[in-house]
Each structure stands twice: as structure tokens, then as C-alpha cells.
């Protein structure tokens, strides 16, 4: 380690490892801390050898000490470890870092007092970090060390001209001459923008210097002149002159310090540019800790770098002025000019107490005012409660305790046997419950009353005269959330006067009171005989009350309370009586708006906070038929993870989310734990992959992202549903399959087994069930408030309405109450009542919306993954920021690249990114949709073939977007415009349900001409055409018929694949010809060159015949933009022509000029290819009308020729060649439908996976005829699943009977819905087209249907495997049989491992996976390699273990033991 290892000797190293990092902490210093400190010294230009002595450490501390108050955490850590090393060198005994800092600072203060005062700066002693030093009475310049320059470069590169750069420059340039400073600037010269800013500041300051210090005139010979501005900047002065100006005896001019000040001004301007946050904008958030606010404040303050007096003023005024109201109140109480340490200490306990104050004030308000009418309260009975009803016999007039009838068996709540009332599933879960004493506690049923109030009750209270009629209503000694204060006090006094009875009911043990948290639990308590009302608050440590006197035996104490600190009196061992129990605890008295009992009293009372479980009905869940639950062993876990899982499981069990699995449960799923993002807490994960495989399928969860372009509403509120999964119960019959085992450390005891009672995370059904449950909960509320917009996405709910503030708040309150009543929690900290609302990446206001702040990443090295994320952010921003472009950035990651592959930026991509950054810096706002206002869409074309559009209502922009999908190298502007219109139409239909009026940059005539002949899209919305000034037009005029009397050019090109040499040329019908020799070309390029040659040499009107389908395809598309130079030349020439006819003729067989030109360009290049099978292929197509791939497969002709044959057929050229593709479904899945043609009924069945069809004409569309057809189909082909629409014939009993007898699962969809039975609907269309082609070959419709079915099954090739549907179906059946056979053969080789030896090596290797066992050898798989090993060199063992985790160190041990056993064998 060099000098790093010599910093401390062996003895001092031992002493270092005894010093603690923090007072009272467990962690101690290690040698790695010294190594880290050595590396950090380079940043400050300090030699690592300084750490080897006490004096050296003292020099380091002098440099670092002034920077510590405003420095970063790394700087403070470096200062701390240097203090510890200093104390070790000084032989000072220290226990921890704080002691070392005190001793080091004491030594620094003593040395400062000993230093003599000087009036002018002098050069430092030898060995300092200064370039000018005094040797023998003369000043000598030493160049800056590479370490100093390296530290400066590192500082700039790492901080990116952040606030730390300015103080870093001050420290590193101390004592430097202008020459040295220029050397530092040259080291970071690649930052051109920053350097230009600094140069401008230098020029301005130099001009000001020259104006303020005019030249005195000619100087005597030999006398040193006064420095000019350029001299200070080091451009017209030497190093010697700079030293003389700095250190001359009379009138020294500190040119170095002056130049440093200029550079600092420039750096400050750079910092402000790179870090635009102003010190005035640094304000503390309502819940932001004061320390975090101070860190941000000082970071921005360092960027200011103003005069120390100004900085001091900012600290004393702005720091306090911009704090939140709670901290500001505390800070003002500290008096004038408090120190930073005092401010941090005073605000340490405040983390947004304003919120706490509002909550407590709300609690007090709710306790003293009537509750609002809850949702659907009209369905609940009003009035007082009825008479007492016995739970045992059901009669009125007495309670169950007084009942003389025999005790009824089973639950008193629901009447069912098998459980008691305390465990009744219909009982509402209690939140706050006293722990049971003695036997199991009997818990009474508990639900909110009709008025929304909550009550407290014990079983013996009905005997005191309380009314408990209504079954679920529970009386209370005091009403906690409704009624007036007088009734609260009256009820409390009555309860106190009644004699206290023992809460014991027969043999059922102690019955504890329950407190629901639908409202805040306010109860009456007696403190040393003084009656008070208190709020039970489990979020507070201490208890504090007001308005009582407990004597003079107290301890003064200051606690963080509402609005700041509260002076209180703390009394210990005070007698408190609450809810029938007497305890002695510590309590404080002081000025508090509401009395609180905190955890110190609640724990003494035995109260716990219990999690609610939703009262929604569990969804029935089953395993797949014939499947069983997972039985996978738990893999070993580390001690740390076991303890973490134990704590998590115990907490979940207390909250009712888990329960202990019975010993008869045979199922198990592995569990493990990972660290959360903060690295302090653990998260439990269950590997539900096996359970997911055997669980039934669920509706696919389609969390469609809701847009924020909702209709404009007056008020908006956002609420969050917390822990939704854990609030919904799991089907009790399915819970057994979720069992998992928590192992014990060292297997000291059997693992504890649990099962889930709620929806577990990671299980496939949780999302679907949660979605379904939330919809059922919200549906009644939506119907009751039809004028309110409720958007739910995951656990975020947005409520928007035009109601008044009071009515809107009431709706929100009712929705929250409804969710709480159903068991869903709505955390207050995520409740957003006032704008702006943070929702789904947006900031919402009632009248406008914006995107949340978008920050583009800054990276040194860009990878493919980083580029993908950058494009995603830009695409997200494009919905509001017009002009966002990503074309050149996307080009950076074209091709097959790995995610971690490094990407080099091009100039165009960098320019595009910088342009996007400028766009994102501008403020953009969106508007909401207004009904009955016309919706408009304006399309614009930008450079580089990128399109932008905005959807607006008048001048209110609802949405903007971009389109840049250019799939072809050569494309047409009108075609792209059609795709843009298609995209806008789909978006508008989905979001607003209507098509906008389009403003398009094209003339209607141009559009109509292109659309008639060259349509290329599947769907275009209807619109009212409003053309803007045209930017798009058809570039040239292609005619459909040959031009009479004009010259005809026959073009051709050829290329030798080996030499890449080629020729291009043409021959005309008038005897002209021309050939051009090409090098390094291709056949396609040669064909294009020949076409361009003909265009160049021809008249304004010309006929051109080509034999290249490639050229014909490009010209027919009428491209206007291209990336190919030769195509660009063709476009340029075509624009000049008045009219051009382009024809295509396949091959060159006997076609006059085409054959001649082919012979002309083929000499020495290629052999002529005669396609003799064209005519048979054409005859085959005229007979069967097969598709392109069938012709290619059967006749071996090129695909271009086959495609032209199909396109030339007038019966097949209705809508071009279809794009073939098949949906690969299960082997036994068919779709069936009925269609009509010529008054006949045709029943069609399609095999989904292969496209094979069965079709015939049936006399009637009845269930009987359909059942007969289905039976005929099932007798020919394997069918297990039939999907149809819900027509009467398909839902008839006859069809269902056949399906049951054959064993077919039948599902239904919606008629004519493409998503329901899209395959058979499309096949009906193709079948009718095929019938139309063959109709003239048969008389009856029955015959032509069967002929068309034959052609579609045997004459239509394509899709998966390039097969016909008949070949594909037979292949699939055969493949399925082979798979089943091999699976049966290979099943016995599973779960076996093989250890083997190779060659003469006696060491056993493995284990490998057994693939096959033969008579003389075995085939094994080791990693990705397949090996054949003789039987005599292989040992086969059975593998009994389950899956293994990442930290199962036992696996390696087991493997090692197995190898040793195999070797000994």
C-alpha cells in the first residue's frame, strides 16, 4: 500500500481500532477508513505523507477547518478521521470521534494564538502548497504540482460546476500567480461554454481596471511598470513581473488575488447557469425536516459566493424567513442572531407539526360537533334504540347473562356452529383492543351505528340499563364521535356513579372493550380524582392533559407540541382510571388544545392497534382441474433473514393478515427476505411461482392508464387507498395453499407455519380480485353521485365535480367513510385536498394541468438501457411540450444491442437532445375538455420528416403529440399524414369519444388522388376537411396507361455477386441504347441506376418498362422523402417530367426490348434466367386462386413473380395481398359461427391455431343442425374448447348436450365483436371472397362452399411454418403425440443427478442433470454442455432437495459432502 500503509505504525493501528465512530456506538475505526482518507486528500491537493506525522495532520486540519461548517458529508468525515489520526500521533487517549475533534480543535486554537500578526501577506514557509516561495531572500516560482491540477480537474468533472467548485478554486489557487491560474483554466478547457463565460467576465473586469487605473505615461528605464488589465490576466506579462508586482516593498499589487476574484465572478455565473436555483427560492416544505432544509439552503448559499456580511445576513434572515410556520415560530423564540447549532437543536423534533395540529383540532371538532350524514344513510333507521334483546334465546326484556334458557351452542353473532362469537367472520375487526386476561376474551360484534357514531361497550353493561337492540349496535359509557358535550359529560358521570363490576362472563374469561377508529377514540378518564376527556393516540409517546392541578412535585420539561415547543410539568406515578381500569403512570400537564393519552399509558392498559380486514365478500378461488397445491421445501436462510421474517410474521399475525397453519396442512411455498431501498428494513417475499401455475386463470388485469384530460370541473381531490391487498380477505377454502414455513435458527425447533388470510403479494389472483373488489365498492357510490367523476388507477382515486366546496368536501368525506367502513384505509398523509395535486406524474389544478418536473439524466457513459429510459422520458413529455424530437436519439440504438452496451453520441443526436432540453425549460400548461365545444386537431410537419399535432378547443390545448414512425427508407408524405390522422382519431375516440375537426397541411385534391389509388392504412376516421396552407403535394404525375407516340425505354441492371461489378443500361423502341459500368454495387442499385439513366436521357413524356419489382414498388409509392442518394436523384428527375408511364414485365422471355436490354447489360456479369414455370403457375392460380407462398412453394418461382401473378388477378386484387399470420392457441381450440350467402346458411368452424376450416350449408340455423355439425366435427378432429357467440342455436340444449358428451368446454362472446370471436369472423370474410372467385365454376352454393373450403385448407400457404392450414393441423397433432411420448419416456430421469469422471482424472465432477441412461453410457447436461459418459465412470444419485435460495450456504456444504461420498464410493 506504500504510504497508505505507513500512515500508522502497528501499535497506533491497534489504538485506531479501539476508537468508536460515534459516542456509545458499536462500530469502530478500521484500516479501510485510513485508505479512504488518503484517496480523499487528492481532491484538496494535499500530500498523503502529511498523515504520517502530527504536524502534517495539523496542516491538513488548518485547510479543512474553515470548510467544515458548510462542507459536504464527505468533507466532514475526512475532517473527523484526520482528527483521530492527529490524536494518535499526539499520543492522546480518545474513546470516540467527538473527543478527538475537541482535542484537535483545542490544539488548533492554541497554535492560532501563538501566530504573530502581520500587516501584509508573506510567502509561506518551504513545503507549503504555494507556487511562490522565498529562498535565500528571493521569491522563486515553482510550477503547480500535478496533484493540485488533478484535484482541480476532478473537482470540476465530479461537481459539474456545482456550488462546491468556487470554494474549491479558492482553496487550490491560494497564493497563485495569474500564470498558475491560467494553467488551471487550461486543464478544463473542454468545457467551452463555461470557459467562454469566464473569458467575457475577464474582459469586462480588465476594461474596468484600465479605466480606473489609467497609464501614468512613459516610465523611466529599468523601472517596473504598473500592471494593466491584460497584465493581470497573464496575457501580456511574464511570471517574473507578476511576482515582482505581488511582493515588491512599495505599493504591491496582488495581481494573483485580483485575477482570482475575476475568475470567481465567472465561476459564480457558471454555477448559477448550471444550478439555476436561487437562494430566495429555497423554502422549507410543510413536512420537511429542518436539517434537510438547512442543507439545501447552504448548498445554494455557496453558489452565491457574495460578501461574508451579505451571507451572514442571509443566514440570519432568509434562513428563518423561509422556514415553515412551525419551525419559524420556534426560531423566533430563540432571540436575536441565534447560532446554527441552536437552530438545528431547537427544530430537531419538528417534522411538520402543522399537520399534527390540524389533525388534533379536527379530532376535537369532531368530538364536540355532530357527525355529517354518511353515505346511504337513508337506508338506515333513525330514532332511539329499542329494548334489550337476549343473544341466547332471542327474547326481549333481559340480557344473555340473565337468561335462564339452556345455553345455545355455536356463535351468538351468526348462529353457525364451529366457532364462538369472538372469532365470528361476520364480526367487524376491532382496532384498539385490551389484551385478554385469563381465558379467551369474548368480543362483541361491532359496527358503526346508523348515524355514523362509534361506541364502546362491555358485556355486563346491558344489565345496567343500556339499550342494545338492533343486534350489531353496542352501547357505550360515552359517545366518542357524535352528540354534544353535555351528553358526553352526563354519560361519563353516570358511569362513574355506578358500582364497578368485574368484567367476567361465565367461563368465557375477561371481555375487553374495543375502540373503532372510524372516528377518533375520545373517552373519559379520571386523573387523581379529576375528570377529563382524552384522545387515545397510539402515534404519541407521552401523555399530556390541560386544566388539572396535580401539586408541586413535578419536573419541568419542554416537549415538541402544536406550533412549536410547550412548557409542561411532568408528574410521575399518577393514578389514572380509564375504561374501568386503574393504572399508575407518568403524565404531563400543559397548554394543549386536546388532551392525549399516548403509548406510555396505552401500553400499561394493554391496548394494541389492530389492522382492519375488509368486509367485502371473498371471491371464490380454485385450483386448476387435476392440480394440487405446491409442496416445495423451504430452503435454508441466514440467521439475519430468519429473525427479520419472524418479526414481520408476528406483526402480520397480530394485524390479522396471517394465521398459524394447522399440522394437517401438507402444502408449502418457500419464503425469503430482501432489504428495502433504504437498506435498513426487510421485505418478506413468497415464491408463489408454483402456486401460480396450478391456480385457476383470472381475468387479465388491464390497468389502462387513465389520462388527465377529464372534463373541466370546479373542484378536484386526490385520495390514496393504503394496503389494498391486505384489506381484502382471501377465500377461506383457498388459504391452505398459501402455507409457508418460517425456519428456526440452526433448526433448534420445528419451523412455524403460517397461511394468508388476505390477498398475498406475488400471487396471480391478487390484482384481479383487488380490481373487482374495488369496483364493487365504488359502483354504488358512482351511481349515487352520477355528476361526480371518479377515476381509479391502482390505489389512487381522483374525485372531480362542479359542486360547491361544502358539497364536494361532503362527497369526499362520504367516499372516505365508505372506504373506511369497508376496511380500506385512506392515509391522511397522502390525502390531497388543495392544488396542485400530484397524480400519476401530473400536477393538477381545477382549470389547468402540467407535467411534474421533468429532469433529463446527465451521464458520463451512456448505455442502451440509459438511452431507452431517456426516450421514454421524452415521449412522456411530448404529450404537453410541442416540438420534442427523438428520431436521431433513437438511431443511436438501432440494431441488436445488449442493454449494457455503450453508445456513442452523434452530433445530430446531441443537437436534438440540447433542443429538447431548451423546450423542457419552458413552462407549458394543458387545459381540460369542455363538453359541447368543438374539438379540433392541427397537424404540422417539422424538419427531418417528423410530425407534430395538437388537439385543442379554441386556444385551449388539451393534448399535443408527435409522430415519426417511418418504416420504409423511401416514403410518401401523404401516406405519413394518413397514419398521423389515424393515430389522432384513435386517441380522440378513446379519451373524449368523438372525432376532432382536422386541420391538415394538404389540399383535398391531392389527398383524394392519393387515397383513391394508393391507400395504405386500415382505418381512417371521418372528418370535416379544413386545409391549412399546403406543405404536402404529390411530387410527380404517374399515369396508368401507356403514352401513345412516346418513346419507350426498357431498363435493366445486373451485378456479379463475387466481384461486385455491375452494369446498368436501357434500350428504346427507336433503336437507342446506353450502358453504364458500376463498381461495388448490388442488383437492386444497378436496377435503380438504369431507371435513373432512362429518366435523365428521356423526353418530358416517356414510357419506361422495368423488370425489377423492387424498382416498381418504389416508384409506385411516389416517395417524396428518402435516405438513398440514387432514389433522391430519381425523385428530382421525376418532378421535371410532365407525364411518366412505368410498366413492369417479369423475366425476359421473348419480351422484345426487355430481352435485348437484358442481353446488353448481362455480358460478363450474369447468366440469363428463364422462368419456364410462370405459365403453369398462372394456370394454377386461375383455377384455385391460391396465395403467393403456395405458388412459390409448388412451382419454385421467385416471390416477386408470384406476388405479381396474384396482383394481376382481377379477382384477387380487391384489397391487395393480405398479411398472413396465425394466432397460436391450444391444440383443441375451435371457433364456430354462422354466416349467410345467397339466402343460404353456412356454418363455419375454424381451428384457431392452424387456420384449418370446416364449412357446409345447413338447412336451418337451429340447435339441432348445429349440434349435428359439432358432432361431425368432433368425430374428425380433436376438440376440447369451443368458442361461439351467444346466438340461440349455440346456446341451445342440443349443443350443450353434445359438448357435455364429447367433453368440450364451451365459452361465449358477443356477436360481431372482433375481440370475442375474431378468428372465425375474419374467416367468414375470406371464405366469401374465395367463394366469389370460384362461383362461376359450380352451379349450387353447396358445391362451391366445399370447393372454397378445399382451396383455403390446401392451397393457401403461409403463417407459422410456411405451411397450408391442413399441413399445419396435422403437424400440430403429430407434434403433440411425440411430446407426450417423450415426456412419458423422460419422466423417470427427472430429479436424478450424475457425478462423473473424465479421462484419467480421478476427481469426481458434477453434479450434472441426467438426460438419458443407456446400457453402456449416460447422457448428462452440465451447464449448457451435453456430455456422454461411460456407465463405469458415472454415479447416479437421486436429488431430494427443493429449490435453493441465494444465501443457502448449506447447499455448498451438501454438494461438497455428496462429492466426498461419491469419491469414496
UniProtKB/Swiss-Prot annotation:
Gene3D superfamilies: 1.10.10.200, 1.10.1200.30, 3.30.70.270, Acid Proteases (2.40.70.10), HIV Type 1 Reverse Transcriptase, subunit A, domain 1 (3.10.10.10), Human Immunodeficiency Virus Type 1 Capsid Protein (1.10.375.10), Immunodeficiency lentiviruses, gag gene matrix protein p17 (1.10.150.90), Integrase, C-terminal domain superfamily, retroviral (2.30.30.10). The record marks 217-218 as: Cis/trans isomerization of proline peptide bond. Protease: The viral protease is inhibited by many synthetic protease inhibitors (PIs), such as amprenavir, atazanavir, indinavir, loprinavir, nelfinavir, ritonavir and saquinavir. Use of protease inhibitors in tritherapy regimens permit more ambitious therapeutic strategies. Reverse transcriptase/ribonuclease H: RT can be inhibited either by nucleoside RT inhibitors (NRTIs) or by non nucleoside RT inhibitors (NNRTIs). Residues 186-223 are annotated as: Interaction with human PPIA/CYPA and NUP153. Residues 655-844 form the Reverse transcriptase domain. The keyword Transmembrane helix does not apply. A motif (Nuclear localization signal) lies at residues 26-32. This is Gag-Pol polyprotein. It comes from Human immunodeficiency virus type 2 subtype B (isolate D205). The lineage of its organism: Viruses, Riboviria, Pararnavirae, Artverviricota, Revtraviricetes.
Amino acid at each position: 500500500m506504500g504510504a497508505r500503509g505507513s500512515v500508522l505504525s502497528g501499535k497506533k493501528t491497534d489504538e485506531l481500532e479501539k476508537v468508536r465512530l460515534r459516542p456509545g456506538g458499536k462500530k469502530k475505526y478500521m484500516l479501510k477508513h485510513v485508505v479512504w482518507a488518503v484517496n480523499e486528500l487528492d481532491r484538496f491537493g494535499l500530500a498523503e505523507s502529511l498523515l504520517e506525522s502530527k504536524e502534517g495532520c495539523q496542516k491538513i486540519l488548518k485547510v479543512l477547518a474553515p470548510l467544515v461548517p458548510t462542507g459536504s458529508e464527505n468533507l466532514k468525515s475526512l475532517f473527523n478521521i484526520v482528527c483521530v489520526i492527529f490524536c494518535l500521533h499526539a499520543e492522546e487517549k480518545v474513546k470516540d470521534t467527538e473527543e478527538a475533534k475537541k482535542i484537535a480543535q483545542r490544539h488548533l486554537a492554541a497554535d492560532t494564538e501563538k501566530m504573530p500578526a502581520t500587516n501584509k501577506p508573506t510567502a509561506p514557509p518551504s513545503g507549503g502548497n504555494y507556487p511562490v516561495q522565498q529562498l535565500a531572500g528571493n521569491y522563486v516560482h515553482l510550477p503547480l504540482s500535478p496533484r493540485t491540477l488533478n484535484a482541480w480537474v476532478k473537482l470540476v468533472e465530479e461537481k459539474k460546476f456545482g456550488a462546491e467548485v468556487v470554494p474549491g478554486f479558492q482553496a487550490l489557487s491560494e497564493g497563485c500567480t495569474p500564470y498558475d491560474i491560467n494553467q488551471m483554466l487550461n486543464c478544463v478547457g473542454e468545457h467551452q461554454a463555461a470557459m467562454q463565460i469566464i473569458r467575457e467576465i475577464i474582459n469586462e473586469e480588465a476594461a474596468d481596471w484600465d479605466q480606473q487605473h489609467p497609464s501614468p505615461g512613459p516610465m523611466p528605464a529599468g523601472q517596473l511598470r504598473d500592471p494593466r488589465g491584460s497584465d493581470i490576466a497573464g496575457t501580456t506579462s511574464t511570471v517574473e513581473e507578476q511576482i515582482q508586482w505581488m511582493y515588491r516593498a512599495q505599493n504591491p499589487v496582488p495581481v494573483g488575488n485580483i485575477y482570482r476574484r475575476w475568475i470567481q465572478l465567472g465561476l459564480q455565473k457558471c454555477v448559477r447557469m448550471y444550478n439555476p436555483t436561487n437562494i430566495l427560492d429555497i423554502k422549507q416544505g410543510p413536512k420537511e425536516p429542518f436539517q434537510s432544509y438547512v442543507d439545501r439552503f447552504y448548498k445554494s448559499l455557496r453558489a452565491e459566493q457574495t460578501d461574508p456580511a451579505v451571507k451572514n445576513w442571509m443566514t440570519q434572515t432568509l434562513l428563518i424567513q423561509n422556514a415553515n410556520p412551525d419551525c419559524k415560530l420556534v426560531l423566533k423564540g430563540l432571540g436575536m442572531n441565534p447560532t446554527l447549532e441552536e437552530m438545528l437543536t431547537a427544530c430537531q423534533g419538528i417534522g411538520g407539526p402543522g399537520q399534527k395540529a390540524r389533525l388534533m383540532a379536527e379530532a376535537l371538532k369532531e368530538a364536540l360537533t355532530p357527525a355529517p350524514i354518511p353515505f346511504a344513510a337513508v337506508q338506515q333507521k333513525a330514532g332511539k334504540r329499542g329494548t334489550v334483546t337476549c343473544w341466547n334465546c332471542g327474547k326481549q326484556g333481559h340480557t344473555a347473562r340473565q337468561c335462564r334458557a339452556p345455553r345455545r351452542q355455536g356463535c351468538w353473532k351468526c348462529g353457525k356452529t364451529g366457532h364462538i362469537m369472538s372469532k365470528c367472520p361476520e364480526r367487524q375487526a376491532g382496532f384498539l383492543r385490551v389484551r385478554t386476561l385469563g381465558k379467551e376474551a369474548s368480543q362483541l360484534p361491532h359496527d358503526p351505528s346508523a348515524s355514523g357514531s362509534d361506541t364502546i361497550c362491555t358485556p355486563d353493561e346491558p344489565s345496567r340499563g343500556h339499550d342494545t337492540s338492533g343486534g350489531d349496535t353496542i352501547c357505550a359509557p360515552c359517545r366518542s364521535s357524535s352528540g354534544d358535550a353535555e351528553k358526553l359529560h352526563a354519560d361519563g358521570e353516570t358511569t362513574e356513579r355506578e358500582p364497578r363490576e368485574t368484567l367476567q362472563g361465565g367461563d368465557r374469561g375477561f371481555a375487553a372493550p374495543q375502540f373503532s377508529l372510524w372516528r377518533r377514540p375520545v373517552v373519559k378518564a379520571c386523573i387523581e380524582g379529576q375528570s377529563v376527556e382524552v384522545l387515545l393516540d397510539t402515534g404519541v409517546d407521552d401523555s399530556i392533559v390541560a386544566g388539572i392541578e396535580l401539586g408541586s412535585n413535578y419536573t419541568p420539561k419542554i416537549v415538541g407540541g402544536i406550533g412549536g415547543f410547550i412548557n409542561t410539568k411532568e408528574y410521575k406515578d399518577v393514578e389514572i382510571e380509564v375504561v374501568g381500569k386503574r393504572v399508575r403512570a407518568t403524565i404531563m400537564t400543559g397548554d394543549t388544545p386536546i388532551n392525549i393519552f399516548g403509548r406510555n399509558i396505552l401500553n400499561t392498559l394493554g391496548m394494541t392497534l389492530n389492522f382492519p380486514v375488509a368486509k367485502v365478500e371473498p371471491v371464490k378461488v380454485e385450483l386448476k382441474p387435476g392440480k394440487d397445491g405446491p409442496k416445495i421445501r423451504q430452503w435454508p436462510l441466514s440467521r439475519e433473514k430468519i429473525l427479520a421474517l419472524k418479526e414481520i410474521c408476528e406483526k402480520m399475525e397480530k394485524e390479522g393478515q396471517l394465521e398459524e397453519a394447522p399440522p394437517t396442512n401438507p402444502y408449502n411455498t418457500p419464503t425469503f427476505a430482501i432489504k428495502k431501498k433504504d437498506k435498513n428494513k426487510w421485505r418478506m417475499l413468497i415464491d408463489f411461482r408454483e402456486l401460480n401455475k396450478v391456480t385457476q386463470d383470472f381475468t387479465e388485469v388491464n390497468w389502462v392508464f387513465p389520462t388527465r384530460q377529464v372534463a373541466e370541473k370546479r373542484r378536484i381531490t386526490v385520495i390514496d387507498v393504503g394496503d389494498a391487498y391486505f384489506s381484502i380477505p382471501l377465500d377461506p377454502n383457498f388459504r391452505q395453499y398459501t402455507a409457508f414455513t418460517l425456519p428456526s435458527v440452526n433448526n433448534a425447533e420445528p419451523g412455524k407455519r403460517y397461511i394468508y388470510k388476505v390477498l398475498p403479494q406475488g400471487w396471480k389472483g391478487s390484482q384481479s380480485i383487488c380490481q373487482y373488489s374495488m369496483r364493487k365498492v365504488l359502483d354504488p357510490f358512482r351511481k349515487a353521485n352520477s355528476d361526480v367523476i371518479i377515476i381509479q388507477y391502482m390505489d389512487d382515486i381522483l374525485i372531480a365535480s362542479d359542486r360547491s366546496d361544502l358539497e364536494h368536501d361532503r362527497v369526499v368525506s362520504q367516499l372516505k367513510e365508505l372506504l373506511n367502513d369497508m376496511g380500506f384505509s385512506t392515509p391522511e398523509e397522502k390525502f390531497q385536498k388543495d392544488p396542485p395535486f400530484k397524480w400519476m406524474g401530473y400536477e393538477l389544478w381545477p382549470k389547468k394541468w402540467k407535467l411534474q418536473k421533468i429532469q433529463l439524466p446527465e451521464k458520463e457513459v451512456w448505455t442502451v438501457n440509459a438511452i431507452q429510459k431517456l426516450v421514454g422520458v421524452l415521449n412522456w413529455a411530448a404529450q404537453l411540450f410541442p416540438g420534442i424530437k427523438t428520431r436521431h436519439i433513437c438511431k443511436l440504438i438501432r440494431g441488436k444491442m445488449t442493454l449494457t452496451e455503450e453508445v456513442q453520441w452523434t452530433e445530430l443526436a446531441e443537437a436534438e437532445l440540447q433542443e429538447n432540453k431548451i423546450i423542457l425549460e419552458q413552462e407549458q400548461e394543458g387545459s381540460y375538455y369542455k363538453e359541447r365545444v368543438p374539438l379540433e386537431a392541427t397537424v404540422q410537419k417539422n424538419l427531418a420528416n417528423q410530425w407534430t399535432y395538437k388537439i385543442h378547443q379554441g386556444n385551449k390545448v388539451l393534448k399535443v403529440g408527435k409522430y415519426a414512425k417511418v418504416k420504409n427508407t423511401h416514403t410518401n408524405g401523404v401516406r405519413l399524414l394518413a397514419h398521423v390522422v389515424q393515430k389522432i382519431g384513435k386517441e380522440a375516440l378513446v379519451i373524449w369519444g368523438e372525432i376532432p375537426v382536422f386541420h391538415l397541411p394538404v389540399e383535398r385534391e391531392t389527398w383524394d388522388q392519393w387515397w383513391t389509388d394508393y391507400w395504405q392504412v386500415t382505418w381512417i376516421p371521418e372528418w370535416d376537411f379544413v386545409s391549412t396552407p399546403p406543405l404536402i403535394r404529390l411530387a410527380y404525375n404517374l399515369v396508368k396507361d401507356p403514352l401513345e407516340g412516346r418513346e419507350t425505354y426498357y431498363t435493366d441492371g445486373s451485378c456479379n455477386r463475387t466481384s461486385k461489378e455491375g452494369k446498368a443500361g436501357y434500350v428504346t423502341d427507336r433503336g437507342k441504347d446506353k450502358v453504364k459500368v458500376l463498381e461495388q454495387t448490388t442488383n437492386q442499385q444497378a436496377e435503380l441506376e438504369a431507371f435513373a439513366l432512362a429518366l435523365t436521357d428521356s423526353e418530358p413524356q416517356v414510357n419506361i418498362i422495368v423488370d425489377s419489382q423492387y424498382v416498381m414498388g418504389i416508384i409506385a409509392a411516389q416517395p417524396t422523402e428518402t435516405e438513398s442518394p440514387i432514389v433522391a436523384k430519381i425523385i428530382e428527375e421525376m418532378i421535371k417530367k410532365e407525364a411518366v408511364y412505368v410498366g413492369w414485365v417479369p423475366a425476359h422471355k421473348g419480351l422484345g426490348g426487355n430481352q435485348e436490354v437484358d442481353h446488353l447489360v448481362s455480358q460478363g456479369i450474369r447468366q440469363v434466367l428463364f422462368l419456364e414455370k410462370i405459365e403453369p403457375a398462372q394456370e394454377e392460380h386461375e383455377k384455385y386462386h391460391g396465395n403467393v407462398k403456395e405458388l412459390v412453394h409448388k412451382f419454385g418461382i421467385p416471390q416477386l413473380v408470384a406476388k405479381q401473378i396474384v396482383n394481376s388477378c382481377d379477382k384477387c386484387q380487391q384489397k391487395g395481398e393480405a398479411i398472413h399470420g396465425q394466432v397460436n392457441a391450444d391444440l383443441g381450440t375451435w371457433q364456430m359461427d354462422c354466416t349467410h350467402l345467397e339466402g343460404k346458411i353456412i356454418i363455419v368452424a375454424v381451428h384457431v391455431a392452424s387456420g384449418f376450416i370446416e364449412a357446409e350449408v345447413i338447412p336451418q340455423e337451429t340447435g339441432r343442425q348445429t349440434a349435428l355439425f359439432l358432432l361431425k366435427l368432433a368425430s374428425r378432429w380433436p376438440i376440447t374448447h369451443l368458442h361461439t357467440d351467444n346466438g340461440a342455436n349455440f346456446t341451445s340444449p342440443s349443443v350443450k348436450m353434445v359438448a357435455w358428451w364429447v367433453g368440450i368446454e364451451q365459452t361465449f362472446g358477443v356477436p360481431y365483436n372482433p375481440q370475442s370471436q375474431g378468428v372465425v369472423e375474419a374467416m367468414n370474410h375470406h371464405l366469401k371472397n374465395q367463394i366469389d372467385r370460384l362461383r362461376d365454376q359450380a352451379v349450387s352454393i353447396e358445391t362451391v362452399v366445399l370447393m372454397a373450403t378445399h382451396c383455403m385448407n390446401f392451397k393457401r400457404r403461409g403463417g407459422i411454418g410456411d405451411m397450408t392450414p391442413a399441413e399445419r393441423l396435422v403437424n400440430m397433432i403429430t407434434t403433440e403425440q411425440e411430446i407426450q411420448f417423450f415426456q412419458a419416456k423422460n419422466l423417470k430421469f427427472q430429479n436424478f443427478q450424475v457425478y462423473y469422471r473424465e479421462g484419467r482424472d480421478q476427481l469426481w465432477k458434477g453434479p450434472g442433470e441426467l438426460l438419458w441412461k443407456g446400457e453402456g453410457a449416460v447422457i448428462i447436461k452440465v451447464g449448457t454442455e451435453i456430455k456422454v459418459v461411460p456407465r463405469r465412470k458415472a454415479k447416479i444419485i437421486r436429488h431430494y432437495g427443493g429449490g435453493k435460495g441465494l444465501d443457502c450456504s448449506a447447499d455448498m456444504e451438501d454438494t461438497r459432502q455428496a462429492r466426498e461420498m461419491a469419491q469414496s464410493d
